[in-house]
Swiss-Prot record:
This is Uncharacterized hydrolase/peptidase y4tL. Its EC number is 3.-.-.-. Pfam families: Creatinase_N (PF01321), Peptidase_M24 (PF00557). GO terms for molecular function: hydrolase activity. It comes from the Bacteria. The lineage of its organism: Bacteria, Pseudomonadati, Pseudomonadota, Alphaproteobacteria, Hyphomicrobiales. It comes from Sinorhizobium fredii (strain NBRC 101917 / NGR234). It is an enzyme of class 3 (hydrolase).
Length: 390
């Protein structure tokens, strides 16, 4: 029996709008075909969220075709038929003989598809070279010898940086789920409780969702507890929570690929003077950064508003203050850092990430996900900006 089409997260017209924007960029670059390998970009253009990108797969966009063609491993083709907006004949499953083959892989199936189309090997072809191994990139060049290969690694990412209102609604739902995860952490972090049990409850909340909207995936979760608060990307340990512990939590809600992230710091018992001082300074810095957000301001403006504010309290932050966020946790485009002159536009979304790792054994975290509005910003995450004292 053929697999049925699943419920579509966005209407067909929304996907066609996105594809048309990509085709305009293809015209500017004078390419007739674009090979999209980024899983996040494929989600944006088709609605596909299955985790099959660990083997070669590609979305082929032709300037002459309304719908793209998705070429992926044959066993994953039913998921693509089920999840995407495209007709089933636009999903092509390649043979299992290309899996674990030292001589050929799924990208050979993509090149074969291009070569089967009239003139495909003689026109401009855009390829996301940054996502390919050297060997795979070379394959496109040698097997399409007459084609002008154009690197389009981040072309789609820059287009999807400005969200539609439908996408913003999805990110609001994801932000509410992230907030529910923070609240759950506040409820279950207690002395004597295993860190693993805390995160099991938080993960369950992130999957369960809130307001009738389920979390559709689990993003990475970071639980950096004393004496590991100077680290930023480690998981929970096998230890238990103790009186006097500090916990730096970073989680995200996910709705159909769209991510809204949040960070909060917890103190089990009275916080130290140092922790309270950096918390107070960073809240002021966060408010200064958010007050700078408006169309026409630059990412650098936002970052420097934060840096200048915390410096008045004697603190510095060496790392960037955030990054574009949307499909997947971090979009490979703009950063909230000194010198990034990307101008803010309405419906851009960012994770204002103010984690500050001061010493090897001490750091602090605070963050919000926000969108740029016509007049300023809307903070999507709503958890209180407090030092969460247990």
């Amino acid at each position: 029996m053929p697999v049925i089409k699943g419920p579509q997260v966005f209407p067909r017209a929304e996907f066609l709008r996105r594809l048309n924007a990509v085709k305009l960029e293809m015209g500017r670059l004078e390419i007739d075909a674009l090979i999209v390998g980024s899983s996040a970009d494929i989600t944006y253009l088709t609605g596909y969220t299955a985790k099959s990108g660990y083997v070669p797969q590609a979305l082929v966009i032709s300037s002459n075709d309304e719908e793209p063609t998705f070429i992926l491993r044959r066993q994953d083709a039913p998921a693509a038929i089920h999840q995407t907006f495209m007709d089933r004949d636009k999903v092509i499953g390649y043979s299992e003989a290309l899996i674990g083959n030292p001589d050929k892989d799924g990208y050979d199936a993509v090149v074969d598809f291009l070569n089967e189309r009239d003139g495909a090997n003689k026109r401009g072809v855009g390829v996301q070279l940054g996502y390919l191994s050297v060997r795979s990139a070379e394959k496109f060049k040698t097997r399409l010898p007459s084609a002008r290969i154009v690197d389009c690694t981040h072309s789609v990412a820059w287009i999807r940086m400005i969200k539609s209102d439908l996408e913003i609604s999805m990110m609001r739902d994801a932000a509410a789920i992230a907030d529910a995860g923070v609240q759950k952490a506040f409820e279950v972090i207690r002395p004597g409780v295993r860190e693993a049990d805390v995160m099991a409850d938080v993960a369950a909340q992130l999957a369960r969702g809130t307001n009738g909207k389920a979390g559709t995936d689990l993003a990475s979760m970071y639980f950096c507890s004393s004496p590991r608060t100077g680290t930023c990307h480690i998981r929970w340990s096998e230890d238990v929570i103790r009186d006097g512990s500090q916990i730096n939590l970073e989680i995200a809600g996910v709705r159909h690929g769209y991510v809204s992230a949040i960070m909060r710091t917890f103190s089990v018992g009275a916080p130290s003077d140092r922790l309270r001082r950096i918390h107070d300074a960073e809240v002021l810095g966060l408010e200064a950064a958010l007050s700078t957000v408006k169309p026409g301001a630059t990412c650098s403006d936002v970052a420097n508003a934060f840096y200048r504010t915390i410096e008045k309290s004697g603190f510095q932050k060496d790392s960037r203050c955030g990054y574009a966020i949307g499909i997947d946790w971090s979009e490979p485009t703009a950063s909230l850092k000194d010198g990034d002159m990307t101008k803010l536009k309405p419906n851009m979304t960012f994770h204002l990430m103010l984690g500050n790792w001061i010493e090897e054994d001490f750091g602090y975290v605070l963050s919000e996900t926000f969108r740029v509005t016509e007049a300023g910003c809307e903070v999507l995450t709503k958890s209180p900006r407090q030092l969460c004292v247990i």
